[in-house]
Amino acid sequence: MIRHSMTNTSNMNKEEAARLWNDNAEAWTVLARAGYDLYRDHLNTPGFFQILPEINGLYGLDIGCGEGYNTRLLAAKGADMDAIDVSEIFIQKAQEEEKAYPAGIRYRVADAQQLPFEAGQFDFATAFMSLMDVPEPETAIQEAFRVLKPGGFLQFSISHPCFSTPHRRNLRNAQGETYAIEVGGYFQNVNGEWVE
């Protein structure tokens, strides 16, 4: 069972965020590898790769790699990959997969807000649905650009705010299938005033 919602880490420090991800990593890995991460498998990752420039032969960094699923896809496209995650358990799972199916990926536990790499090392960096779970995403983005070579690129995906509104629910047809998502409070400012 996934125990914590990771949608708002802005009021956490990096240690608390790491603890929450470690608490979730085992279940997350089992469920994702069993095909239950439908948004990743059918929406986010295909869309991400559709707009990703050619990376064959490039040196890349995957920030917030989780159990390494998308990192393995990047390596399969010909990139030489390093990958980091704040969760020791996620990195352990990724390394186990790397040992079973070698792709030359180097995984390590690290904080996106303080990357353990020299400046100007990477041709590109990616962050698949991870930056919104970093306590200081601005710092993580600055760090990503610090380790990129001149002309390198960062490509990332994050969740859209409409998916974390206070009044969100799935609308279902008579067969119980979701046909729409209803959101409320989407245009409400954080201070509670309506935009006019």
Region locations from a protein language model:
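A short SAM/SAH-binding and catalytic strip from SAM-dependent methyltransferases
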Residues: 123-137
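Class I SAM-dependent methyltransferase SAM/SAH-binding core
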Residues: 59-114
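Conserved class I S-adenosyl-L-methionine
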Residues: 6-55, 69, 73, 90-93, 153-193, ...
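Short conserved AdoMet
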Residues: 53-56, 135, 149
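A short glycine-rich, Lys/Arg-flanked "PGG" loop and its adjoining helix->strand segment in the class I
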Residues: 138-153
